Amino acid sequence: LDISLLNGYWEIQSVKQDNKLLKTYPFSGIIDYFEIKNGKGLRKKVMPKIDGKFEASLHKIDFNISQKNGKTTLEYIDKNNTFIETIAKLDSTELFITNKENYIYHYKAYEKLNFD
């Protein structure tokens, strides 16, 4: 798994649990931004603007990256909470993240708004 592909903007498409589709997102006004450096990363919520820039929300969380037994995990460190997500699939266009509650989050690489 090339973890560097996680860098950038990702738009949620759907959420599943136990092979049941729970929610689809035809359009989301909030995008997840990931930044990876030296085995650590940050994830924050941003909102795309018409001018192609992003407005950052106050929601930001740091994480550590671990690769064991062929699995890549993100260990999030929040004030009083630690939780782990696993990257099930990652390429230049798609991202699938799972957690211990068996939720599967499907993202696609964000494409900037084009009003031309």
Where are these regions (language model features)?
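N-terminal helix-cap/turn-to-beta initiation motif at the start of protein domains
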Residues: 1-11
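Short, solvent-exposed coil/turn segments at beta-strand boundaries
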Residues: 6, 33-42, 67-71, 88-95, ...
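Short, solvent-exposed loop/turn elements at domain surfaces
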Residues: 17-21
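N-terminal glycine/threonine-rich, aromatic-flanked beta-hairpin/loop signature
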Residues: 23-63, 69
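Well-ordered beta-strand positions in beta-sheet-rich domains
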Residues: 33, 60-64, 82-84, 104-106
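Short beta-strand segments that buttress and anchor functional surface loops
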Residues: 73-78, 95-98
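Short, exposed beta-strand-loop hairpins at the edges of beta-sheets
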Residues: 84-87, 92-106
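C-terminal partner/receptor-binding element of secreted or periplasmic proteins
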Residues: 102-116
